[in-house]
Swiss-Prot record:
Gene Ontology biological process terms, A to Z: binding of sperm to zona pellucida; chaperone cofactor-dependent protein refolding; positive regulation of protein targeting to mitochondrion; protein refolding
Organism listed in the record: Sus scrofa
Keyword presence, Nucleotide-binding: yes
Family: Belongs to the heat shock protein 70 family.
Stated name of the protein: Heat shock 70 kDa protein 1-like
Self-association and partners: Interacts with PRKN.
Organism taxonomic ancestry: Eukaryota, Metazoa, Chordata, Craniata, Vertebrata
One Pfam family of this chain: HSP70
Residues bound to ATP: 14-17, 73, 204-206, 270-277, 341-344
Keywords: ATP-binding, Chaperone, Nucleotide-binding, Stress response
Keyword set includes Glycoprotein: no
Superkingdom of origin organism: Eukaryota
Length: 641
């Protein structure tokens, strides 16, 4: 594949599903994966023989829950002892371990224990999205815009960028999901004067509310709020708990400790939840759920709404908070935009509509695809796409949390206020606290609390060599500079000597080192090569199997009676049966062995078959265009649990 210089893709890397789009020929194409789905599960599975990503991984989760990793987005950029990580670990079937304060996922792959950083798991999903785009475009793609929740802090953004690098992508920019949705929306709404838009994004794992003003192609984010831990999965959890209780009542058995049963129940619950968005009742039918018991039951929409009532109602709190932060009355909002699959739930729509006094909600954008759509447009802008559609679009993003430093008494002195438009640069003069102080410790924090101890320490550095002077005399100029990706540079300069020191907050708290990233890039290539070998092996195995079965059916064809000698027929059948028995006993053989076996079989069969067909043919198998030696490559059908 040749790389096309000018193409960049937009990737919505979601907690539960991901989506990829590209802007070409003046419009956005959302790209379907190899299964024909326009969204791909953010799942990676490891087995004894291979690594699976996307639909294939999610489809086998019931059989292999310990080694199927999802929700990497909940781990990325966090510390192991983060309360979010600790509480989520209780719900995950896979094991999370602590390595130097960072969480790693422990799985068994090809018979060995392996531990992966969340960045590596996310990079595998990004690789899948990259390959999906490449299959559609027909050439290699390296440039991408990746989206993150507005609430992500600096280390989470940086870790997401690292995941892109490991996947072999050049990450042009990390942008906020609601901002991306606003772009998708803004394209359709160009030229209507200033509009205030509220974006309500309830996805599989995160919930974001953002208020933007769109004016003449300029987007400005006024406020963001939300809950990093609310989404479709939480609604699934409520259904799972409900049915676990029902199973207890009906069958006096507790299935909650059986991971496979719970996983199968969860899959059925997710399906039921989707059904309830369009029907008032959904049926669940799970054969042999636990100890041979079939579980057939149903749930009404009303019951589902009751089970999730507090979660649904809770979605309005961030709406109110965002309005307060934007200093805006709800009557001032022109448009309410729904993003994320969970916004299809009728009750969620009703609550939001009632809150805005019956206003129409905007559902014109497919809620699953809006974010990737916007990311694809942003990617085109950054690559210098000259088409009229994207020419006049300017994007102003915001800092999700206030940034500042610690001053005397542990006070948080804010330099960049939360919701400030980025990129931005703020400078302030500070001084010494005691006489003849030789240096100052600059400690950088993010957060909204008055005292730094309640906020999040991003990094610290010393500025030394300050000439002796009474307290309050030295002038130390501190500059906070955030770039368009939300990455922070802090510089401190002593005005009298010109001595300076700086820090780029790319996070000591969980940032991967350059060496680690390089190692992971190499690992990713190695895994990809292994996946390729595995695919070739399976193709060779299938080719042998198909050839043997085709030969057996060819010589057993009624139409060939009398045309083939019994000796020849027996020879072929014996050889085919021998090959099939060998195959049965050597499922894990190498590609060369399968190929060798097939060639061996062909040497016996082909001369007989060729002689047969050259000798004229009148049977029903004539004229079917069957060519000996060409293995059938039909679809593989598998049951999904």
């Amino acid at each position: 594949m040749a790389a096309a210089k000018g193409t960049a893709i937009g990737i919505d890397l979601g907690t539960t599903y991901s989506c990829v789009g590209v802007f070409q020929h003046g419009k956005v194409e959302i790209i379907a994966n190899d299964q024909g789905n326009r969204t791909t599960p953010s799942y990676v599975a490891f087995t004894d023989t291979e690594r699976l990503i996307g639909d294939a991984a999610k489809n086998q989760v019931a059989m292999n829950p310990q080694n199927t990793v999802f929700d990497a987005k909940r781990l990325i950029g966090r510390k192991f002892n983060d309360p979010v990580v600790q509480s989520d670990m209780k719900l995950w079937p896979f094991q999370v371990i602590n390595e130097g304060g960072k969480p790693k996922v422990m799985v068994s792959y090809k018979g060995e224990k392996k531990a992966f950083y969340p960045e590596e798991i996310s990079s595998m999903v990004l690789t899948k999205m990259k390959e999906t785009a490449e299959a559609f475009l027909g050439y290699t793609v390296t440039n991408a815009v990746i989206t993150v929740p507005a609430y992500f802090n600096d280390s989470q953004r940086q870790a997401t960028k690292d995941a892109g690098v490991i996947a072999g992508l050049n990450v042009l920019r990390i942008i906020n999901e609601p901002t991306a949705a606003a772009i998708a929306y803004g394209l359709d709404k160009a030229g209507q004067g200033e509009r205030h838009v509220l974006i309500f994004d309830l996805g599989g794992g995160t919930f974001d509310v953002s208020i933007l003003t769109i004016d003449d192609g300029i987007f400005e984010v006024k406020a963001t709020a939300g809950d990093t831990h609310l989404g479709g999965e939480d609604f699934d959890n409520r259904l799972v708990s409900h049915f676990v209780e029902e199973f207890k009542r009906k069958h006096k058995k507790d299935i909650s400790q059986n991971k496979r049963a719970v996983r199968r129940l969860r899959t059925a619950c997710e399906r039921a939840k989707r059904t309830l968005s369009s029907s008032t009742q959904a049926n669940l039918e799970i054969d042999s759920l636990y100890e041979g018991i079939d579980f057939y039951t149903s749930i009404t929409r009303a019951r589902f709404e009751e089970l999730c009532a507090d979660l649904f109602r809770g979605t309005l709190e961030p709406v109110e908070k965002a309005l307060r932060d934007a200093k805006m009355d709800k009557a001032k909002i022109h448009d309410i935009v729904l993003v994320g699959g969970s916004t299809r739930i009728p009750k969620v729509q009703r609550l939001l509509q009632d809150y805005f006094n019956g206003r129409d909600l905007n559902k014109s954008i497919n809620p699953d695809e809006a974010v990737a759509y916007g990311a694809a447009v942003q990617a085109a802008i950054l690559m210098g796409d000259k088409s009229e559609k994207v020419q006049d679009l300017l994007l102003l993003d915001v800092a999700p949390l206030s940034l500042g430093l610690e001053t005397a008494g542990g006070v948080m002195t804010v330099l960049i206020k939360r919701n400030s438009t980025i990129p931005t640069k703020q400078t302030q003069i500070f001084t010494t606290y005691s006489d003849n102080q030789p240096g100052v410790l600059i400690q950088v924090y993010e957060g909204e609390r008055a005292m730094t101890r309640d906020n999040n320490l991003l990094g610290r550095f010393d500025l030394t060599g300050i000439p002796p002077a009474p307290r309050g005399v030295p002038q130390i100029e501190v500059t906070f500079d955030i770039d368009a990706n939300g990455i922070l540079n802090v510089t401190a300069t002593d005005k009298s000597t010109g001595k300076a020191n700086k820090i780029t907050i790319t996070n000591d708290k969980g940032r991967l080192s350059k060496e680690e990233i390089e190692r992971m890039v190499l690992d990713a290539e190695k895994y990809k090569a292994e996946d390729e070998v595995q695919r070739e092996k399976i193709a060779a195995k299938n080719a042998l199997e198909s050839y043997a079965f085709n030969m057996k059916s060819a010589v057993s064809d009624e139409g060939l009676k009398g045309k083939i000698s019994d000796a020849d027929k027996k020879k072929i059948l014996n050889k085919c049966n021998e090959a099939l028995s060998w195959l049965e006993a050597n499922q894990l053989a190498e590609k060369d062995e399968f190929d060798h076996k097939r060639r061996e079989l062909e040497q016996v069969c082909n001369p007989i078959i060729t002689k047969l067909y050259q000798g004229g043919c009148t049977g029903p198998s004539c004229g079917t265009g069957y060519t000996p030696g060409r293995a059938a490559t039909g679809p593989t059908i598998e049951e999904v649990d």
